[in-house]
Swiss-Prot record:
It holds the Pfam family Acetyltransf_1. Belongs to the acetyltransferase family. Gene3D superfamilies: 3.40.630.30. Keywords: Acyltransferase, Transferase. It comes from the Eukaryota. One of its GO terms (molecular function) is acyltransferase activity, transferring groups other than amino-acyl groups. InterPro entries: Acetyltransferase_Enz, Acyl_CoA_acyltransferase, GNAT_dom. It comes from Dictyostelium discoideum (Social amoeba). This is Uncharacterized N-acetyltransferase DDB_G0290199. Its EC number is 2.3.1.-.
Amino acid sequence: MVVKIVEAYEKVDQVKILFKEYVEWLNIDLSFQNFSEEFNSLPGKYSIENDGRLYIAYSDESLAGCVGLRKINIEINENKNNQQVDHDETSTIIIKKEQQQQQQQQQQQQQQQQQQQQQQQQQQQQQQQQQQQQKICEMKRLFVKSEFRGLKIGKLLVERLINDAKEQNYDYMVLDTLKTLTTAISIYKSFGFIEFDPYYYNPNSNDVTFLKLKLK
């Protein structure tokens, strides 16, 4: 048994065969992902011109599986916890006059508010810069025909895609998969994927696991 992974940009008919089987196997309505548009415009977002990738796998000469990669415009916040501002504790000057004390308190409050506003502005700027600088891709349509499962074809497809994403200078790779697909999830995690929050609207989000992989 020889497994061969090849570029599929000129093999759209074969990709469509696999995509159809993939949807039938999932048994889920993918209209919320605009699947029909994706299907009819192949290779579309998976094309090299769009910073994508599209592969099919053969077992000997038999069509066995597929996978795609496409660029996605989302933001991944590397710092989950918001940083707190460390304010210097100034020694309290004892002032006998109540008016002076009130003025000092008001000034301190104003300074704290200004510091908080500055910090918020800095955080917003950092997030905007991070979003502009981040290059993120999404793994889609990983599928292996039932008669070829157990031959590590899925793992080979994932490995190929990750290597390509690194060569394309992507910062992160993300994906979503059904929680019931435990074998697929174990493969993803073996490559270093970790779970994180949903990155797009999915009506089946309670049944879906969202994963990300830092590539740099």
